[in-house]
Amino acid sequence: MVMKIYNTLTRKREDLLPSEEGRVKIYSCGPTVYNYAHIGNWRSFIFSDILRRYLKYKGYNVYHVMNLTDVDDKTIRDSQKEGMSLNDFCEKYTKIFFEDMDILNIQRVEEYPKATDHIKEMVDITKSLIEKGLAYKSEDGSTYFSVSKFKEYGKLSKIKLDNQQSTERIKNDEYEKDSANDFALWKSYEESDGEVFWETELGKGRPGWHIECSAMSMKYLGDSFDIHTGGIDLTFPHHENEIAQSEGCSGVAPFVKYW
């Protein structure tokens, strides 16, 4: 009997039909390591663990990747408050995260990539999006994804941008841009970033939040894979932006079969 899985993309229960017979590739949005993970975070991580265990029980070969966000507005802000380097600060909370995982008996997945180890991949995707006319550089040196150029934007969250008011998650991710809906792929350096920056072909700065997951998922799982999990609060804008970036860069759809 074919396993059924609920797909947020279609709002339906569907037959689980992996791209490779007998093998399921999963990506889970992991923690931002700036504080202790809270109960809502753990609900998402426990769900992905149960899913992984059940798929293995059913005989599937599971390859599961969960990222660690170790550079963003929150990690920079709080590392400065504690007077620690970004690396030392994030290592502290990464260690605590894994200790808590063990307490909750959550199995380790195959890969735990860190955002800061994948800057090259983020730059390469951003350059590709610029070349394809899907991204642009603003006057302040930041690079943005042009949402209006991606015609299928909103297919996951079902949000109509004409009626969408700016949210905190959108506002906090942007500097100067052409449209309120556009989001940062690369943020130009500001003094408030302190020592956190990379000198790249995109200029001196750091990655936007959304590009991190596209870069890491595509590196380890390819341009299209089976299942993506994460908190419901990430459906918009984070997961919606992941789809736009990834499909815009690779030209392959769907980026993910089951959300």
Report each predicted region and the residues it spans.
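N-terminal, positively charged nucleic-acid-binding surface of large information/translation enzymes
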Residues: 10-15, 19-107
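The substrate-binding groove and active-site-proximal loops of carbohydrate-active enzymes
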Residues: 80-86, 110-116, 203, 231
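Alpha-helical recognition segments enriched in aromatics with Gly/Pro capping
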Residues: 1-34, 45, 49, 121-259
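Hydrophobic residues at beta-strand termini and immediately following loops
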Residues: 65, 113, 186
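Short, amphipathic alpha-helical segments
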Residues: 87-91, 95, 113-123, 177-180, ...
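Residue-level recognition of the N-termini of beta-strands and the immediately preceding loop/turn
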Residues: 62, 109-111, 225, 256-257
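Short, glycine/charge-rich beta-strand/loop segments that flank catalytic centers
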Residues: 68-72, 94-97, 107-122, 140-150
